[in-house]
Amino acid sequence: MAGGPSTSALAIAVSEAGGLGFLAAGYKGADAFAEEIRAVRAATDRAFGVNLFVPGIEPADPESLGEYLRRLAPEAERQGAELGEPRFEDDDWAAKLDVVCAEHPAVASFTFGCPDASIVDRLHEADVAAWVTVTNVAEAAAAEAVGADAIVAQGAEAGGHRGGFVADGSGEEGIGLLALLRILARARPLPLVATGGIADGAALAAVLCAGASAGQIGTALMLAPEAGTPDAQRARLAEPGPTRVTRAFTAAPRAGSSTGS
């Protein structure tokens, strides 16, 4: 839950309650990330994890970006806004890996890609388990090949970004969580952590029956008092409505609350 909702207070509260609290490294500098890890460690002796964005290997297609900008132009003009220039960065990838190895949280999970085997080896040397977010069998195979300790199986029900990195023909809508778990349970021997639409005990029981070793909760915790969720987002989440998949803001598919056409 990068971008605000993830806080050290939320990670502490989850771990103290018996879960495995996570800190999101996305959209913040390496120094701020390190400070949050230290704040969690100072407040609890329970295990916790961190999540990192894996930078894209392939450059964005200029033609596709140009078409996207052209489609946005009328709305930008209507709102009196200027379209910015595309920016490409790696979210302080190398520096954040250094932080993880130095601070050694229990788990480092990865989204938008699969770290190299050399990175996984480095994490293991620092006594950090490596989890990789996947949305299909091909991605799970990639995670297994680099030595990942567990697979985070993200179903289409998940809010926020799609964590996939290998196209499998299922489109942006993706595969439902229970179906994905059954597929991966048969295809891959690694432990499965289920995520996507888990908001209560019944949903958690369902994913455990489908082959998961654990369940991961995201959106449901955005209303927790410890979360850094802005008031406008809290109000929107408190009134359930339709969602849609969009590439707005980051160009990566993400599911969010629909605010109009």
Language model region names:
Residues 1-187:
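Active-site entrance/lid segments in N-terminal catalytic domains of soluble metabolic enzymes
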Residues 161-193, 198-261:
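Conserved active-site-proximal phosphate/metal-binding subdomains
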